[in-house]
């Protein structure tokens, strides 16, 4: 009588394979997390660039109109409801007053974001959208904190966002993953 052929793996072989798979998984997961954070940063930088382009387009339209100072309901841009600051930067839509504050109250920033980025991610004053908007710095700046990544931190501690200054027209990515605070 001969010996039977050996089918399958021994317990030791299975344990070795499981340990090796565990080591591979332990080294791969942090790299995947880093890739996710990098992808979110790239997405926010893209949204910031799109917002900046839209603000620059509105500013150019204001310059073509002769740089007339503060405008309510600027004709020739979008549906004609965009309001421009004294310096020619977007302030909001249908503000109804001639001050240089961004928008109407807390809704001003997300109304401006949603107007300029028609096909982009949405913003709101709460966490129900991809971006949560905040009006601050004397009501002349907006921060749009990226919430699609699950971040629940306050504006000043947010991981990622977009910062807009209606006095200078500057737009930048912000957050703890960048060098700029939101």
Residue locations for each model-derived region?
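N-terminal leader/signal peptides at the extreme start of proteins
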Residues: 1-9
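Short, contiguous, well-ordered secondary-structure segments
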Residues: 1-2, 19, 57
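Internal alpha-helical transmembrane segments of multi-pass membrane proteins, especially GPCRs
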Residues: 7, 13-16
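Alpha-helical hydrophobic helix detector
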Residues: 15-30
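Amphipathic alpha-helical protein-protein interaction surfaces
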Residues: 20, 37-40
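Phosphate-coordinating loops and pocket residues in cytosolic domains that bind phosphorylated ligands
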Residues: 34
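Membrane-proximal N-terminal amphipathic helix
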Residues: 39-69
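Periplasmic/extracellular, small/polar-rich flexible segments of pilin-like filament-forming proteins
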Residues: 63-182
């Amino acid at each position: 009588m001969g010996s039977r052929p050996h089918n399958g793996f021994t317990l030791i072989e299975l344990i070795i394979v499981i340990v090796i798979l565990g080591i591979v998984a332990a080294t791969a997961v942090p790299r995947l997390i880093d890739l996710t954070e990098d992808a979110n940063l790239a997405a926010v930088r893209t949204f910031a660039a799109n917002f900046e382009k839209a603000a620059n387009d509105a500013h150019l339209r204001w310059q073509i109109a002769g740089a007339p100072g503060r405008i309510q309901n600027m004709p020739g841009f979008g549906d004609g409801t965009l309001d421009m600051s004294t310096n020619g930067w977007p302030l909001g839509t249908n503000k109804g007053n001639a001050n240089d504050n961004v928008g109407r109250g807390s809704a001003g920033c997300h109304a401006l974001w949603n107007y300029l980025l028609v096909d982009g991610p949405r913003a709101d004053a709460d966490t129900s959208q991809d971006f949560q908007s905040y009006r601050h710095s004397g009501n002349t700046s907006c921060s749009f904190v990226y919430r699609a990544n699950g971040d629940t931190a306050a504006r000043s501690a947010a991981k990622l966002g977009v910062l807009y200054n209606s006095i200078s027209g500057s737009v930048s990515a912000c957050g703890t993953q960048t060098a700029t605070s939101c």
